[in-house]
């Protein structure tokens, strides 16, 4: 009678599984087919046994055996190969931590500044670590120094040139526009000076010695003419400045003379007024008291005669 194999499914070794795969039909145990019970599972009594053709009798109630229904291939230990392989297969899952990454063009100005600052700090830290290890360092690849040089001179072109408001706001906008216009003018002047110097240097390098001497003499002649013209203009400016001063002095003297003459005439007028009043007072005393005037009678509206009084007309 064949011995009964009591083997657990969880204790099947990989060597036994591989041997079961290779051997295939050489030692494939036959599985006993149990009757299908659609109404419910039938429990076999503890003493009942299942007969197998090769292995003999196996107790039905033993928990260590793997009893699989259907025609599936089992390992010599009694467990299926597919179940073991499925249990040992490693399945990778995506990380639960999601990186909130956005393109550089979609970032705001503050976010761009923060990202650039982080990258510069990281680059500086890496360079320090490499320098500490004694490794050769390449120059830091950046063009920020060029942008800093240009930002000092370039004006702000994003300012809207609209009508200025009244009050302090208008004054502030006027001051800002004046400052921006001045900065823009200085930038254009410096740019023109640099371009002119570069062009002049290139033109001088391409000239011969005789041409340079001739240009030098021409420049000396122009310099002497400019100095003479400057002296002449200064002399004219001095004369023109002296003439208004003389005119002002003459006008001041004329005003003073007229003021003195006016004061003298006022005094004479007051004196004549005093003398005229004194003569009027002495004339009635020499001629005597005047006779009273006789008022002529007049006729009233009622036909009666009357006399005018001193206050009547």
Swiss-Prot record:
Pfam families: HEXIM (PF15313). Belongs to the HEXIM family. Keywords: Coiled coil, Nucleus, Phosphoprotein, Repressor, Transcription, Transcription regulation. Residues 139-142 are annotated as: Interaction with P-TEFb. Its main location: nucleus. The modification Phosphoserine is found at residues 28, 52, 75, 80. Residues 112-131, 179-194 have a biased composition (Basic and acidic residues). Residues 207-276 form a coiled coil. This is Protein HEXIM2. Transcriptional regulator which functions as a general RNA polymerase II transcription inhibitor. Core component of the 7SK RNP complex: in cooperation with 7SK snRNA sequesters P-TEFb in a large inactive 7SK snRNP complex preventing RNA polymerase II phosphorylation and subsequent transcriptional elongation. Gene3D superfamilies: 6.10.250.2910. InterPro entries: HEXIM (IPR024872). It comes from the Eukaryota. Signal peptide: none annotated. The coiled-coil domain mediates oligomerization. GO terms for molecular function: 7SK snRNA binding; cyclin-dependent protein serine/threonine kinase inhibitor activity; identical protein binding. Homooligomer and heterooligomer with HEXIM1; probably dimeric. Core component of the 7SK RNP complex, at least composed of 7SK RNA, LARP7, MEPCE, HEXIM1 (or HEXIM2) and P-TEFb (composed of CDK9 and CCNT1/cyclin-T1). Interacts with CCNT2. Residues 1-78, 111-139, 155-194, 267-313 are annotated as: Disordered. One of its GO terms (biological process) is negative regulation of transcription by RNA polymerase II.
């Amino acid at each position: 009678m064949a011995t009964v194999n009591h083997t657990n499914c969880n204790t099947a070794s990989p060597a036994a599984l591989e041997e079961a795969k290779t051997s295939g039909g050489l030692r494939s145990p036959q599985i006993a087919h149990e009757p299908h019970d659609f109404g419910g599972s039938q429990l076999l009594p503890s003493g009942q046994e299942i007969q197998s053709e090769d292995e003999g009798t196996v107790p039905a109630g033993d928990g260590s055996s793997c009893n699989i229904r259907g025609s599936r291939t089992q390992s010599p230990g009694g467990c299926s190969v597919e179940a073991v392989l499925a249990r040992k297969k490693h399945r990778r899952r995506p990380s639960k931590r999601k990186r909130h990454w956005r393109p550089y063009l979609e970032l705001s100005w503050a976010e761009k500044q923060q990202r650039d600052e982080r990258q510069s700090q990281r680059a500086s830290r890496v360079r320090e670590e490499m320098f500490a290890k004694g490794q050769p360092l390449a120059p830091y690849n950046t063009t920020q120094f060029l942008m800093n040089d240009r930002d000092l001179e370039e004006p702000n072109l994003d300012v809207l040139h609209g009508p200025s408001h009244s009050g302090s706001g208008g004054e502030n906008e006027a001051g800002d526009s004046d400052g921006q216009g001045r900065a823009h003018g200085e930038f254009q002047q410096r740019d023109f000076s640099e371009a002119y110097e570069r062009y002049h240097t290139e033109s001088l390098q391409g000239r011969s010695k005789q041409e340079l001497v001739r240009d030098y003499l021409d420049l000396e002649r122009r310099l002497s003419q400019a100095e003479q013209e400057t002296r002449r203009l200064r002399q004219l400016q001095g004369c023109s400045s002296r003439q208004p001063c003389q005119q002002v002095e003459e006008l001041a003297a004329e005003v003073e003379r007229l003021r003195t003459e006016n004061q003298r005439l006022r005094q004479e007028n007051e004196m004549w007024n005093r003398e005229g009043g004194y003569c009027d007072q002495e004339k009635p005393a020499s001629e005597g008291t005047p006779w009273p005037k006789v008022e002529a009678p007049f006729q009233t509206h009622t036909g009666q005669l009357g006399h005018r009084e001193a206050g009547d007309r």
